[in-house]
Amino acid sequence: GLMPEEDYDLAGFAVGVVDKKDMITGENLKPGDVLIGMASTGVHSNGFSLVRKVFEKELNKEGLETYYEELGTTLGEALLAPTRIYVKALKAVKNAGVTVKACSHITGGGFYENVPRMLKDGVRAVIKKDSYQIPPIFGMLAKKGDIEEHMMYNTYNMGIGMVVAVDAADAERAMEAMKSA
């Protein structure tokens, strides 16, 4: 439909170029390589149809400005936390001399659809869910919407916005580079 005259919709995108020699293809990925997850800032830009359904009653000025102790902020601030951009961290890893063998931006389809895309045949991922903190917005969504864990991981990034694979010998150096970025 048409938007009211006083409303607006804002969208943006970026286009990049990469030399073929610098492409991250996953072809050198092997069993024993290490996956490193980079923290997300929250929901990012996916799963908002479900967010709207779950928080239907709160999607007004009063509801969005309500402070929630478990979030440490208002619902509106938690839902609209800017999407983290990972280019600085990836550049820092490259500048540290670490080869990123494969990577996956955890967007639509969540963990369960995106991580397998970075893997080549014969390689599987083992994710230790207790190795990182899940931002509280996801717990609130799951509880309020009565959403099963599998569906949450199939829809949202669950606190990890990007996953990279590196050689086990390079894992510590890669993580230090990411922290410094």
Where are these regions (language model features)?
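Glycine-rich beta-alpha junction loops
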Residues: 16-18, 33-35, 39-44, 52-55, ...
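Glycine-/charge-enriched secondary-structure boundary and capping motifs
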Residues: 3-10, 60-80, 84-181
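Residue-level recognition of conserved structural "scaffold" positions that shape functional pockets
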Residues: 23, 49, 54, 115-117, ...
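Glycine-rich anion-binding loops of enzyme active sites
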Residues: 1-49
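Acidic, glycine-rich loop-and-beta core segments that form the ion-binding/anion-interacting portion
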Residues: 29-77
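A short, terminal or domain-edge coil/loop segment
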Residues: 14, 45-56, 155-162
